[in-house]
Regions:
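Helix-to-loop junction immediately C-terminal to a conserved catalytic motif
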Residues: 49
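ABC ATPase C-loop
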Residues: 152-153
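Catalytic Walker B motif of ABC-type/P-loop ATPase nucleotide-binding domains
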Residues: 160-164
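Hydrophobic alpha-helical transmembrane segments of multi-pass membrane transport proteins
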Residues: 372, 386-457
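Topological signature of polytopic alpha-helical transporters
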Residues: 1-15, 19-22, 27, 36, ...
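Helix N-cap at the start of a conserved alpha-helix in ABC-type nucleotide-binding domains
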Residues: 171-173
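Conserved catalytic motifs of ABC-family nucleotide-binding domains
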Residues: 68, 81-91, 104-105
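Alpha-helical transmembrane segments and their short interhelical loops
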Residues: 178-180, 190-204, 212, 371, ...
């Protein structure tokens, strides 16, 4: 499809970032957008992709203004490669294809599409390698970049926008990437627009067209091969041994006088007959638009004569087709597909976190130590405090670990989600529900192992109380995770999140009912804000309700029992129920459990809405 942007002005915060920029990109060709840093290259790409609004000017594709549907048919490869690091390249591509290709495509079709792209982008060697990140070795920089491009190509986009695809790559990798893009554009008749920083001259001449921006103004648009000539004519000449790409950028940055010379030479050219008809001012264009296909391509500037009527016609048919298919369909796939695919991916990513070596070591070490410390605890008044300590500790470990893990994990996950949501892959609700589902099973595995071993090693109340304790602590873990997710969403940054989480945890712990059971009256209400308090109360209930009696403390000269039963009568044991009374656990079990559900739901729902409205991803920066 032919992309034409004319007289594009973009203003951000009252600052004119793009000033009357025009250009076009034709199917089968590569357009390079170059300019010094801060010139407005990314802004131009963002504007074409529809992520920054135009202040004035027009952007059309085959003569039609870009609609939302059409925008879904163009792809945008961001400068950073953002992925879930633990997934392999094939998993990543399969997920992308399944969530972005229409539901009616069969699995075989999707797989063959993915295979085709893996071939096209020469990624066969690393399909089973994990994506990796700074901590985990995975794909190399160049492979990752190609993976980013591959993720965009699965949908067979009509146009490909790339922001600095070669930065961070060595010369030969960069060269082969651009060469690959060039042959892809030619073979599949795609329009490719890419910003590029400091290309070598051989990379530079791979591009058919060049658009130069300087301080938001157009400094050149036309054939790449003619830019040096243009500079000559503008009275800015180049030594013969120079790399033209270095030369033009150097000149644009040299001083204001040279820059103005170039910009005004460009202005002159825009008013000359050399300037493409399609980029002329709007009055000229009105005649032109009546018959967009038959308009003579009267531009001498184009090196190859404009002979791609056929391709234009083909893509116009394509355009009609897309209009039919996706007119009122906001998402490429239905909710169910999105939910299923996101759940599967969520399962894979959280599996690698939860079953990681470190997690395993943590669980095993803590389980062993706790079992040894409290092994077969005698049921006596003297060890009452130990028993409570154990119950409190279980709550602390199983509540705060998921809380911390989530606070740390979410900001990284958010980057991927933001990228995908900006490109309109799926609904937020599908993602959020899928996240809850995929993590549910995994988050409960840890309590299951931990509690089962410890409960019987220590010798707590009994079988039915074991199951209830397990259930309570699973809810407790979920409540901790909900709070963590909420804090992660609110802070959006690991360090801020950790600080908030630490404050919350410390306060929650103090109010949790173990360190002090008699808070000052004016502070007492605050314990209700602590999910640890509810869990601890519920655990005490389960341990002492209907449990075996406790042996009274041995009376000595300096101490005696705290329980009246032991003091008054000759009884040597304390009924469990008296312990409950002593610690003011006076309400039925469910009154301690219900608030945990409230914690789970309120924090998750609040997190969803904050994600949806407050932290709306605005720009891909
Ligand atoms: N939200 C914003 N508010 C104010 N100024 C902005 C905003 N976004 C971008 N700018 C400014 O717009 C100009 C162009 O930014 P842009 O990111 O498009 O540059 P660039 O050409 O891509 O640079 P680089 O080569 O360094 O990536 C810069 O001067 C930048 O500071
Ligand atoms: Mg940029």
């Amino acid at each position: 499809m032919e992309l034409v942007f004319k007289h594009v002005n973009v203003e951000v915060d009252k600052k004119l970032i793009l000033n009357n920029v025009s250009g076009l990109a034709s199917p089968g060709e590569l357009l390079a957008v170059m300019g010094p840093s801060g010139a407005g290259k990314s802004t131009l790409l963002n504007t074409i992709a529809g992520r920054i609004p135009l202040s004035s000017g027009t952007i059309t594709v085959n003569g039609h203004s870009i609609t939302k549907d059409l925008r879904r048919k163009l792809c945008y490869v961001l400068q950073q490669d953002i992925f879930f690091s633990s997934l392999t390249l094939r998993e990543t591509l399969q997920f992308t294809a399944k969530i972005r290709l229409p539901d009616k495509m069969s699995n075989e079709q999707i797989t063959s599409k993915v295979d085709e792209i893996i071939q096209d982008l020469d990624l066969t060697r690393c399909v089973d390698t994990i994506m990796g990140d700074v901590w985990m070795r995975g794909l190399s920089g160049g492979e990752k970049k190609r993976a980013s491009i591959a993720c965009e190509l699965v949908t067979d986009p009509v146009m490909i926008l790339l922001d600095e695809p070669t930065s961070g790559l060595d010369y030969s990798t960069a060269f082969s990437l651009i060469e690959m893009l060039r042959s892809y554009a030619r073979d599949h008749n795609k329009t490719v627009v890419t910003t590029i920083h400091q290309p070598s001259s051989s990379i530079f001449y791979q591009f058919h067209k060049l658009l130069l921006i300087s301080d938001g103004e157009l400094a050149y648009f036309g054939d790449t091969g003619k830019v040096v000539d243009f500079f000559h004519k503008a009275d800015v000449s180049m030594d013969s041994h120079y790399n033209p790409a270095d030369f033009i950028l150097e000149k644009l940055k040299e001083d204001e006088k040279t820059r103005l010379k170039i910009v005004s030479a460009m202005d002159q050219m825009r008013n000359s007959s050399n300037w493409p008809v399609k980029l002329r001012s709007s009055e000229d264009l009105l005649d032109d638009e009546i018959q967009p296909e038959t308009a003579p391509p009267a531009d001498i500037m184009m090196e190859q004569p404009y002979n791609e009527k056929d391709s234009v016609r083909v893509s116009l048919i394509e355009l009609d087709k897309t209009d039919d298919n996706t007119q009122d369909q906001k998402w490429p796939t239905g909710f169910i597909t999105q939910y299923t695919q996101l759940t599967l991916r969520g399962f894979k990513t959280s599996k690698s976190q939860i079953f990681s070596k470190f997690k395993l070591i943590e669980t095993v070490t803590l389980t062993i130590i706790v079992s040894l410390i409290w092994f077969q605890l005698p049921r006596t008044e003297e060890t009452l405090r130990d028993r409570m300590g154990l119950l409190f500790y279980m709550g602390m470990h199983l509540g705060f670990t998921p809380l911390f893990d989530t606070v740390i994990a979410f900001p990284l996950e958010r980057m991927v989600i933001t990228k995908e949501r900006l490109a309109g892959w799926y609904r937020l609700s599908a993602y959020y529900l899928a996240k809850m589902t995929s993590e549910l099973v995994l988050i409960l595995i840890q309590p299951l192992i931990f509690i089962t071993i410890i409960y019987w090693c220590v010798g707590l109340n009994g079988v039915s109380s074991y199951y209830a304790t397990l259930g309570t602590l699973c809810l407790h873990s979920l409540a901790g995770q909900s709070v963590g997710l909420f804090l992660g969403i609110v802070s959006m940054d690991i360090r801020k999140g950790m600080t908030q989480a630490t404050i919350y945890i410390m306060v929650t712990m103090l109010l949790g009912g173990f360190y002090t059971r008699s808070l000052p009256v004016w502070l007492d209400w605050m314990k209700h804000l602590s999910f640890q308090w509810y869990t601890f109360s519920a655990l005490l209930y389960l341990e002492f309700y209907d449990g075996p009696d406790l042996r009274c403390a041995v009376r000595t000269a300096v101490s005696e029992s705290q329980f009246s039963t032991c003091l008054d009568s000759n009884s040597t044991s304390i009924p469990s129920s008296e312990v409950l009374q002593f610690y003011s656990i006076n309400y039925p079990y469910w009154t301690y459990i219900l608030p945990l559900f409230a914690f789970i739901f309120i924090f998750r729902i609040a997190g969803y809405f904050i994600l949806k409205f407050k932290q709306k991803p605005n720009q891909a920066k």
